[in-house]
Amino acid sequence: MRVRIRGIYATALTYLFLKNGFEIVQQTPQIAERFFMDIIRSPADVTVKDGIDKGEIVSVGEDIYNFMRSIFKYSPIWRSPIKLYSVVSTEDCKFMNFIVEPCLSEGLVIKPPVEGKIILSSPRAVGKFAMVWKGDGRTFFSEHIDERDSQRLLSVSIPFNKKGYNVKWRSNAAMATTAELKEELENLTMRYSYNDFREQGEDFLKVTLSLEDKLFLDDIRSLVINTMKFHHMLKMTYSNEVDIEEGKVNPSPEKLLTSLIGDNMIEAIEHVKPNGKRVLLKGGTIVQKEIGRDYYWLKIRREFKSGGIYDGLNLKIEDGDYDLVELDSRNWYQIHRYHDRNNNLKGLYVNISTPPELLKNRIRYLDLEVDVVKVNNTVNIIDLEELEANKPILGEFLYKKALEIAQNIKDKLNEDKI
């Protein structure tokens, strides 16, 4: 299988795909140089790249789910139940219980239900190199196609434009021969004219990377080029600064880690659900911290006004309440200690999650949907049903890890060791 790889994880991913028998194509000059490869200008079967959020990796094309699951054992992987570029028939503005926008009776899936809804366009015939539909006879190009290639592609599509077909050339088109391009357009126009969209559609995966797997990618990248710990996490905020530090003989992430929380304020805590949805929790002031070459630990004070209850603790939120939360890059949990205005402990809530990451004035972790609470000396594991429901996305390793950590925390709380 031929794979095109782009983004901040490209070096580590290239190493892993090569070691597992994949052929890397359309390499950037930098990647070709690092791996002593010739650039292969061949069409890709699958593209692997950063998501819109740099903490995600997406793949579009052939099915590589099993491979991705084998290397990212500690990250949720969402596999779209609906293929990208498939054509679906809807009922009451829904398909497979997902809302579709716009509300078309039939449409091409141009965005899978990553956020709970499917985005459609009018039906199109889609192939490896192009997509075709009836229109005003125009040609469009992927943003990844340069002007030199676009002239050749335009010469191929103009005859089809004259017949009233719109053609959009995909990035793979620049790697195909003229004969291959003509053959695909002929096939696509025929399929479109017969409304035959049965065979089209591409797998879409989204990996929401945990800190654990980012550190794994750091280790893999270090086999190819000088790489310090937290490289990929830091790359989400910094670019040149990371490169400059790694250009030193003995690079250290300490300075960059410290600069992420320079004013000792955390604006928000990003609580990321297994499906990738982000819930922003109230931030606060850093009251204690330790930052080293290979770890960081923070204690944050979060203050509250009255109104509502503490989820999981079933206690009222009152004026003057505050939370002292501890976050440690070495731990798979965060400890929340809720106090009243007189500094009396109201309850303790331990959120089971992947180790927390530092972004610019923010904390991010991946919630594992199970927590442990202690109120009035009674300890309970809560939300086990949520963990079970998310097992397919979390995968076996992460699911078992969450159960193991939750039980361990429960035991420690019962023994007053936390």
From Swiss-Prot:
A Gene Ontology biological process term: rRNA processing
A family per Pfam: DUF402
E.C. code: 3.1.26.-
Keyword hit for Transmembrane helix: no
InterPro entries reported for this sequence: DUF402, FomD-like_sf, Ntdp-like, RNA-bd_FAU-1
Keyword entries, A-Z: Endonuclease, Hydrolase, Nuclease, RNA-binding, rRNA processing
Sample GO molecular function, one term: mRNA 3'-UTR AU-rich region binding
Keyword Cytoplasm (UniProt): no
Similarity comment text for this entry: Belongs to the FAU-1 family.
Chain's role: Probable RNase involved in rRNA stability through maturation and/or degradation of precursor rRNAs. Binds to RNA in loop regions with AU-rich sequences.
Name of the featured protein: Probable ribonuclease FAU-1
High-level lineage: Archaea, Thermoproteota, Thermoprotei, Sulfolobales, Sulfolobaceae
